[in-house]
Design a protein with these regions (language model features):
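Solvent-exposed, non-transmembrane regions of membrane-associated and secreted proteins
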Residues: 4-256, 285
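Alpha-helical transmembrane segments
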Residues: 21, 270-286
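Cytoplasmic C-terminal tails of single-pass
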Residues: 286-292
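N-terminal membrane-entry
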Residues: 258-268
Length: 292
């Protein structure tokens, strides 16, 4: 076998390996993303558990004052007396890198919540929309949490459209767990933000993602209203870090099963085509040897 033939065969083998890599990328990258999310959740829990009561209470009070200022600003806006308080919870509350984390049992979501909605934030978790209430709940508050949908490397809010009225999601903020029950699902244009404002007397949290899937011309708003939290209903036991890690493992397995038809079709086409190329090269080599 001459050098040229060896190079062609080597190239064909490399292409086959590349095809396998392309086909397996979504699953592997999602496993890595899930692992990072699990680590962030564990770090947050450890940070909160290490905080003394005085510091924790001070952080909660700062968050509530911030939310009250947002409510007061809403009243001034309604009266035509808008004023910028210049206050940011970032300057007042320090509980680590993330603000907390969200769990959505129905769609196996367990993600850290970060300040802001930059691309860097939304690639690793859920972002808290600036100008919305700090996600600690309370009367006349409305926190808005945003997440990407349809990324190849992470699931994030991809399955948010499966939530229906009556489903629940949970916010783990400091040492509290806030339960929200979905009471409204809407699709709006990006500039339509009326459904994200504070409603006097209500305690809302709205989850936002792009829709339709992979087109992203509109926004899906899944709003939850605060309901009493029963410590058993979220995971069937007291929430612990080890349980979240188990949930992450279950999520990855579920994703592999759900995505397997697409993975197998894509992988089969790529690998099959490259295997055919390899066979053609081998046939050509054999024919050349016979001719010689």
């Amino acid at each position: 076998m001459d050098t040229s033939t060896r190079l062609k065969l080597g190239f064909a083998a490399l292409m086959i390996l590349s095809g396998i890599g392309v086909a397996s990328y979504p699953v592997i990258s999602n496993m890595v993303a899930q692992r990072h999310a699990s680590t962030a959740i564990q770090n947050y829990d450890e940070t909160v558990q290490s905080m003394d009561t005085e510091k924790l209470d001070a952080a909660k009070e700062a968050a509530r004052r911030y939310n009250q200022q947002l409510g007061n600003a809403l009243d001034r806006d309604a009266a035509g007396e808008a004023e910028d308080t210049g206050t940011s919870y970032v300057d007042l509350i320090d509980v680590g890198e993330s603000l907390g984390y969200i769990t959505i049992p129905k769609i196996d979501v367990n993600l850290p919540i970060y300040e802001g909605t930059s691309d860097d934030v939304l690639l690793k978790g859920v972002g808290h929309l600036e100008g919305s209430s700090y996600p600690l709940g309370g009367e006349s508050t409305h926190s808005v949490l945003t997440g990407h949908r349809g990324l190849a490397e992470a699931v994030l809010f991809t399955d948010l459209d499966k939530l229906q009225e009556g489903d629940k999601f949970y916010l783990h903020i400091m040492d509290e767990v806030l339960a929200y029950q979905v009471d409204q699902v809407k699709v709006v244009l990006p500039e339509e933000t009326d459904d994200l404002t504070i409603v006097q007397g209500q305690d809302y949290c709205t989850l936002v993602t792009c829709t339709p899937y992979a087109i992203n011309t509109h926004r899906m708003l899944v709003r939850g209203t605060r309901v009493p939290y029963n410590g058993e209903e979220e995971t069937g036991d007291t929430p612990q870090v080890v349980q979240y890690q188990a949930l992450h493992t279950g999520t990855v397995i579920k994703r592999i099963v759900d995505a397997w038809p697409w993975i197998s079709v894509t992988g089969s086409v790529i690998i099959g085509g490259e295997a055919l190329l390899l066979l053609l090269l081998l046939h050509r080599c054999k024919k050349r040897e016979e001719d010689d």
